[in-house]
Amino acid sequence: MEWTKHKIAEIYHQPLLELLYRAATVHREYHDSREVQISKLVSIKTDGCPEDCGYCPQAARYHTDINGNSLMSVNEVKQHAQEAKDMGSSRVCMGAAWRNVKDDSDFDQVLEMVKSVNEMDMEVCCTLGLSLIHI
């Protein structure tokens, strides 16, 4: 399907229940509706984010008792992934509090984390903070 602004607007303006129905129909076409995927969320870098996203407990507006940590090591992430796998998870989602992920040694380390978890026959997804893209 080729995505156009018109097609996106058409979907966006549909009633919520119609969207839910269509999404469930497509989901059932490809997945057993009686099964769920178990995932584990791992905060690979906590605290220190300068953003103020209202939904995020790490946002500057919230004063929580979260102990911040710098970027986890690849081995720490692998340990979390193994624990998750042992408990039945098939996916690890890595989250990091960042303003903008740069193409630097931290990003290279995240790529290594992804590769390492994939080598354990697990799926990986990442939420790496707000990224600013300049075109």
Segment roles from a protein language model:
Residues 1-55:
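Flexible, acidic/Gly-rich N-terminal and inter-domain linker regions that tether
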Residues 36-40, 92, 124-126:
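Hydrophobic faces of well-ordered beta-strands that scaffold small-molecule active sites
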Residues 41-43, 97-99, 127-131:
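Active-site beta-loop-alpha junctions enriched in small/polar residues
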Residues 48, 72-76, 105-109:
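Short secondary-structure boundary/capping elements
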Residues 60-96, 112:
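Conserved alpha-helical substructure of the radical SAM core
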Residues 104-127:
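Alpha-helix-loop-beta-strand connector modules within alpha/beta enzyme cores
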Residues 134-135:
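Conserved small/polar residues in nucleotide/adenosyl-binding loops
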